[in-house]
């Protein structure tokens, strides 16, 4: 866009508003980008302490905007269509932030802010969110906002990771890419109720709890040995809070091939995850009401076998 406008003699200016710190504002001492989250977050926090949070009282300057009488383009004019899916209301109450660490991993509990879609479309200010998090003294919530900016600077400095593994040796993995199994994963009929609940929630609402995102992503890549790019593409189609940097970064994290990723031998047990995060089956019951009935799908793969197969394939590719 900048190149096009400048070629027409039109001045193009950008103003930082989507993030606290842009792609090259938080770097190592030698100016190179961070590839590991923890040192990046420390530098990010130090920069925040130094620079503080600038407030922009835009409403005080509304009288300076140009008056014109042209009809504004509607959403339909821009190619959008109405949908029955409703954007979730975000919650940034002091109570939620203070209890975030204790509640965030339980999908049946209203323990997350659901801010993603609002940050994506700019209907909430990142400065306001950071200020709110700091006022409660809860660094766990704040660090999740830092992860977002970490992944954004990674995608800027390493644009090839949009479609390629950050760790190139992982391109040697021989994915099975079974289309029937992928379809069952997409539809939430894998026979693993926690996985199925997440996919059905995604398909129905355009949202999925973060803990469940990690599980369904790991299940696709590790249990079914389906290329992470298939899952990333499906999430890009369905998620209302889709941001390329976070989506790519998190998919490569669960697949083990990304920057600062989980080790490849970390393979979630879908049944154990229920015991830890949905013991009373409240979340599962909401999205997979038939999970205890004979009509429920048989498991698409046996966990022990899938785990051993995954480890063998990964080891073979990385040796």
Please report, for each region that a protein language model flagged, where it lies by residue.
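Generic detector of short, locally flexible boundary/turn motifs and exposed helical patches
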Residues: 2-4, 83-84, 92-95, 182, ...
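Active-site-proximal binding-pocket segments
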Residues: 111-287
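Active-site neighborhoods of enzyme catalytic cores
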Residues: 1-41
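Glycine/tryptophan-enriched, flexible segments
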Residues: 10, 31-170, 273-319
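Low-complexity, flexible helical/coil segments
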Residues: 19-26, 48-55, 73, 180-182, ...
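Short amphipathic alpha-helical surface micro-motifs
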Residues: 16-20, 100-101, 233-234, 267-268
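Short linear motifs at secondary-structure transitions and domain/linker junctions
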Residues: 10-15, 92-95, 225-229, 261
């Amino acid at each position: 866009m900048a190149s096009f406008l400048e070629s027409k003699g039109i001045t193009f200016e950008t103003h930082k508003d989507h993030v606290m710190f842009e792609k090259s504002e938080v770097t190592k001492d030698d100016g190179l980008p961070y590839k590991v989250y923890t040192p990046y977050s420390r530098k990010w926090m130090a920069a925040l302490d130094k620079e503080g949070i600038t407030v922009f009282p835009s409403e005080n300057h509304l009288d300076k905007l140009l008056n014109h009488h042209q009809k504004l383009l509607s959403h339909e004019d821009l190619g959008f269509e109405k949908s029955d899916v409703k954007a979730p209301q975000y919650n940034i109450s002091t109570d939620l932030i203070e209890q975030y660490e204790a509640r965030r991993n339980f999908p049946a509990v209203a323990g997350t802010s659901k801010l993603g879609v609002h940050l994506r479309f700019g209907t909430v200010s990142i400065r306001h969110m950071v200020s709110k998090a700091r006022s409660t003294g809860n660094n766990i919530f704040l660090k999740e906002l830092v992860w977002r900016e970490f992944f954004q600077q990674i995608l800027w400095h390493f644009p090839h990771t949009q479609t390629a593994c950050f760790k190139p040796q992982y391109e040697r993995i021989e994915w099975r890419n079974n289309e029937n199994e992928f379809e069952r994963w997409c539809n939430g009929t894998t026979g693993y109720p926690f996985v199925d609940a997440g996919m059905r929630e995604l398909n129905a609402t355009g949202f999925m709890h973060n803990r469940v995102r990690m599980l369904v992503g790991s299940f696709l890549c590790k249990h079914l040995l389906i290329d992470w790019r298939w899952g990333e593409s499906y999430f890009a189609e369905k998620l209302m809070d889709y941001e390329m940097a976070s989506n790519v970064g998190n998919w490569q994290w669960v697949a083990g091939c990304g920057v600062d990723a989980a080790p490849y031998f970390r393979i979630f047990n879908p049944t154990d995850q229920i015991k830890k995060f949905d013991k009373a089956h409240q979340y599962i019951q909401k999205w997979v009401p038939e999970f205890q009935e004979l009509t429920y799908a048989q498991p698409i793969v046996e966990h022990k076998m899938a785990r051993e197969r995954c480890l063998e394939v990964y080891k073979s590719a990385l040796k």
